[in-house]
Amino acid sequence: MRLLILAVGKLKQGPERELAERYRARFDDLGRKLGFRGLDVHEIAESRAREAPARMAEEAAAIIAQVPDGAVLVTLDERGQSLGSTAFAAQLGRWRDEQVPGTIFVIGGADGLLPELRRKAKLSMSFGGATWPHQMVRVMLLEQIYRAATILAGHPYHRA
C-alpha cells in the first residue's frame, strides 16, 4: 500500500521541513519491510480566490484530481476522530492487509476542507480539539505514520 500526504500550502525550508523529511525517510526504511510501498508528500497550491468557499472549492478540486481510484481518503480536521497511536497503527495495518492500493491523507489550508471533500473521507482524524498550523500538522502526521510503522514492526520507538 502506498501512502500519500496531500497538503495545501508549502512547507518552507527550515526546521519543520527538515523534521518532516526525517520522519518520511525513517518511514520509508521501515515501511518497505512491512509491505508499504513508500510515503510521498505532494503540496497543493493555496487558492488565490477572494472568498473562502471559492478557495476551498478550488483546493478540493486540486486534491481530488490526485486521489487514485480505490484509495482510502483520510482527512485531517479539528472535528475528526482523535485516534491513539496504537489504534492508528492498527487501522493502517488493516488497510494494508486488505490490499487497499493507497491511503491518501489530506491536510487542508487556512480555510479548512470543503464539506463535500470531508464527506468522501473514510476516516477523519484530529490531533485533539486545538487548531494547528498546517506545517505542524504535517510534521505530526509524518511522526504518527512513522510511529505506526514501528508499532506494526514491534520496534521499541513506541514505548507507551
Swiss-Prot record:
Pfam family, one: SPOUT_MTase
E.C. number: 2.1.1.177
Family annotation (Gene3D superfamilies): 3.40.1280.10
Keywords: Cytoplasm, Methyltransferase, rRNA processing, S-adenosyl-L-methionine, Transferase
Subcellular location: Cytoplasm
GO cellular component assignments: cytoplasm
InterPro entries: Alpha/beta_knot_MTases, RlmH-like, tRNA_m1G_MTases_N
SUPFAM superfamilies cross-referenced by the UniProt entry: alpha/beta knot
GO molecular function list: rRNA (pseudouridine-N3-)-methyltransferase activity
Swiss-Prot/TrEMBL catalytic activity: pseudouridine(1915) in 23S rRNA + S-adenosyl-L-methionine = N(3)-methylpseudouridine(1915) in 23S rRNA + S-adenosyl-L-homocysteine + H(+)
Top-level EC class as recorded in UniProt: transferase
Binding sites annotated in the UniProt record for S-adenosyl-L-methionine: 76, 108
Subunit and partners: Homodimer.
Purpose of the protein: Specifically methylates the pseudouridine at position 1915 (m3Psi1915) in 23S rRNA.
The family this protein is said to belong to: Belongs to the RNA methyltransferase RlmH family.
HAMAP family per UniProt: 23SrRNA_methyltr_H
This protein's name: Ribosomal RNA large subunit methyltransferase H
